[in-house]
A protein has these predicted regions:
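C-terminal output helix
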Residues: 91, 109-118
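Acidic, metal-coordinating helix/loop segments flanking the phosphotransfer/catalytic sites
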Residues: 30-48, 52-56
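Alpha4 helix (beta4-alpha4-beta5 surface) of REC/receiver domains from two-component response regulators
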Residues: 63, 67, 87-103
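The C-terminal output helix
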Residues: 119-129
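Short amphipathic alpha-helix used as the core "switch/output" element in two-component signaling
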Residues: 39, 60-78
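Two-component/phosphorelay signaling modules centered on CheY-like receiver
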Residues: 13-29
Length: 129
């Protein structure tokens, strides 16, 4: 069986590389913008996504990240999105879950814990098939 596809959306190349390396039991694809994320989502149809909220052009805020979350769930409602962010944890974690994210994971990233969350998300995704 092939590894599950995972789309990592983050504007920080170092974080994308760290997650890709640390989550090698997934078929990782990456994006650093909304346009690239939507293209990768439509082309690869990953069941799993990690999403940083602080993306350009709103690096200091979260509007772009929440817009991407909405776009993902409109196009692929069964996709399990794990928001991975360091922005205003409590407020944004509640907002992310309310808006359809599977889970919120605060930075800095612990890859072992994130892997467990992604495995649980993939199990949940498979149960919807």
């Amino acid at each position: 069986m092939a590894n599950p596809k995972l789309l990592i959306i983050d504007d920080d190349a170092g974080i994308r590389a760290q997650l890709k390396w640390g989550l090698d039991d997934f078929d990782v694809i990456t994006a650093d913008s909304r346009q690239m994320a939507i293209e990768q989502l439509e082309f690869n149809q990953p069941p799993l996504v990690t999403l940083d909220l602080g993306l350009p052009p709103d690096v200091e805020g979260t509007s772009e990240g929440f817009a991407i979350l909405q776009a993902i769930l409109e196009r692929a409602p069964n996709t399990k999105v794990v928001v991975v962010s360091g922005s205003d944890e409590k407020i944004n974690s509640q907002k992310a879950i309310k808006n359809g994210a599977f889970e919120f994971f605060a930075k800095p990233v612990d890859v072992v814990q994130l892997r467990l969350i992604l495995e649980r998300a993939y199990t949940d995704y498979q149960s919807l098939k």
